[in-house]
Amino acid sequence: MQSIKCVVVGDGAVGKTCLLICYTTNAFPKEYIPTVFDNYSAQSAVDGRTVNLNLWDTAGQEEYDRLRTLSYPQTNVFVICFSIASPPSYENVRHKWHPEVCHHCPDVPILLVGTKKDLRAQPDTLRRLKEQGQAPITPQQGQALAKQIHAVRYLECSALQQDGVKEVFAEAVRAVLNPTPIKRGRSCILL
């Protein structure tokens, strides 16, 4: 059976661990415990093919920047996460996560995932963001960023509501089993 290594990255507290625990156990964790490194494994059947999906949960906090990249070798697909309710985590995809992943693994496919989709219409979240002069990230903003970083797909999910979680990892498997050429936006012109 083919094994696929999927590394999940993104800012601290965007919901990476909840996404992985929800996918592997169908349960939502009750408390937030910052991750240093964790591994999960699941058999996944996608388009009639069964694979062993090795899921790597990484620390988003800056103090783990040097340690985190040790998990990158032999990665088959990256899932870069941001919270729909956190515009700074969205901006960090462009400024931190995409550059880091591309530096270490330039030819590995990327999925961009907006987490905590359930908070987009939640009154307390909307009020908090409005007080900061911000708003939740829209699906259109997610699609635009995915295009900008040449992600294979943009998906949204809510681990709390078990909405879109299975689709994230099905698409991660598809990105490996059915690769599309990765366009990085760089071209070489010889004169």
Swiss-Prot record:
Keywords: ADP-ribosylation, Cell membrane, Disease variant, Glycoprotein, GTP-binding, Lipoprotein, Membrane, Methylation, Nucleotide-binding, Phosphoprotein, Prenylation
Subunit text: Interacts with ARHGEF26. Interacts with ARHGEF16. Interacts with UNC13D; the interaction increases RhoG affinity to the membrane lipids, targets UNC13D to membrane lipids and facilitates cytotoxic granule (CG) docking to the plasma membrane.
One Gene Ontology term, aspect cellular component: secretory granule membrane
Family, similarity comment: Belongs to the small GTPase superfamily. Rho family.
Residues modified as Phosphothreonine: 138, 180
GO biological process terms, semicolon-separated: actin cytoskeleton organization; actin filament organization; activation of GTPase activity; cell chemotaxis; cortical cytoskeleton organization; establishment or maintenance of cell polarity; positive regulation of cell population proliferation; positive regulation of DNA-templated transcription
Glycosylation sites: 35
Major localization listed first in the record, in broad terms: membrane
Post-translational modification: (Microbial infection) Glucosylated at Thr-35 by C.difficile toxin TcdB. (Microbial infection) Glycosylated (O-GlcNAcylated) at Thr-35 by C.novyi toxin TcdA. O-GlcNAcylation completely prevents the recognition of the downstream effector, blocking the GTPases in their inactive form, leading to actin cytoskeleton disruption.
Propeptide stretches in the record: 189-191
Keyword Glycoprotein: yes
Disease linked to the protein: Defects in RHOG may be the cause of a severe hemophagocytic lymphohistiocytosis (HLH). The affected patient shows characteristic HLH features, such as hemophagocytosis, hepatosplenomegaly, fever, cytopenias, low hemoglobin, hypertriglyceridemia, and elevated ferritin and soluble interleukin-2 receptor.
Matching PROSITE patterns: RHO
Entry-annotated residues carrying Cysteine methyl ester: 188
The name this protein goes by in its record: Rho-related GTP-binding protein RhoG
Role according to the record: Plays a role in immunological synaptic F-actin density and architecture organization. Regulates actin reorganization in lymphocytes, possibly through the modulation of Rac1 activity. Required for the formation of membrane ruffles during macropinocytosis. Plays a role in cell migration and is required for the formation of cup-like structures during trans-endothelial migration of leukocytes. Binds phospholipids in an activation-dependent manner; thereby acting as an anchor for other proteins to the plasma membrane (PM).
Pfam families given in the database record: Ras
Motif (Effector region): 32-40
GO MF: GTP binding; GTPase activity; protein kinase binding
Chain positions with ADP-ribosylasparagine modification: 39
Membrane-topology descriptor: Lipid-anchor
Residues at which GTP binds: 10-17, 28-35, 57-61, 115-118
Keyword Cell cycle applies: no
Location of the protein in the cell: Cell membrane
